[in-house]
Amino acid sequence: MNKSFFKRPLYHIAGKISRIMRDFQKNQDDKIIDASNEYWNGLFNGNIFFEYNLNNDVKINLYKDSILSRLIYDGFEKEETDFIEKILKEGDVFVDIGTNIGLFSLLAAKIVGTEGKVLCFEPAPSTFYRLKENVTLNNFKNIHIKNIGLSDEPGELTFYVSNNGYDAWNSFAPSQDNKLESSIQVPVSTLDFELKDINKSKIKLVKIDVEGWEKFVLNGGKEFFIEFSPIVMVEFTESNTFNAGYSVHEIYDIMQDFGYVWYTVKNKTLILETKKLYYPYNNLIAIKKS
């Protein structure tokens, strides 16, 4: 036995033990990650996507090059999808702004049925193609998709896109962490214009997840939100709104000005949401005051 070990200061011994335990835990974590990656990659059987059952009635293609696909496989935003399934009824209209490959829209389409509608807006051409494939996969005739973005005025905007798996982070706001590698020009409209021929009283729920562009989408739907009373689900992410040049608190204030109250969903229950100092990542629910 090395007797000199016992002559060392206790803090030195404790530090060494701590480093050993930390290295051991990192090694264990790395093994878990490696096993998880191996399992995930094995699901594709050499293909670029595989068909996954969201539930007994709805299928979705998940893609090997998409981080969002893996998140969906792991039960991404379960609280939010449960909320949508609880709120929507047959014959309702659901508006999905920032649809991506269609997680929420596919589930909604099954619920609202042939008497209802799902309106989708997805500006990224490659993501839109995958969305279209998922609609076809389920043979849904009640989903109407548009390859455009929404903002506070019509026209054309620069859209920043990822080529390395971060397609769910595509945004009209430039990224500060180099996730978005290139840019394209895409057409944009306003929500008020896009809903002009829709029976707006039938719109039960609007979901807005546009990576920091939420403020501009809401302002582009001002007439609709003030005149009608849809439930609105909005992503609050401070870093995204910072990239777009404003504070996430402006989203909170805009909907309050439109006559709404904010809630959060926890265990399928709505809880009143007072304004917080910081929102790292939350999906909040706005409901019109009665």
Predicted regions, residues:
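Hydrophobic packing residues within well-ordered alpha-helices of enzyme cores
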Residues: A108, L131, F159, V217-G221
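Conserved acidic-Pro-Pro-aromatic motif
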Residues: F49, F193-S290
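Acceptor-substrate binding/catalytic loop of class I
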Residues: P125, K179-V186, F236-Y246
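Glycine-rich adenosyl-binding loop in Rossmann-like folds that engage adenosine-containing cofactors
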Residues: F50, D57-D82, K141, K146-S201
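S-adenosyl-L-methionine
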Residues: M1-A124, Y129-N134, N138, I198-K200, ...
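Short, glycine/acidic-enriched loop or turn micro-motifs at the edges of active sites
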Residues: T99-I101, P125, L150-D152, V210-E214, ...
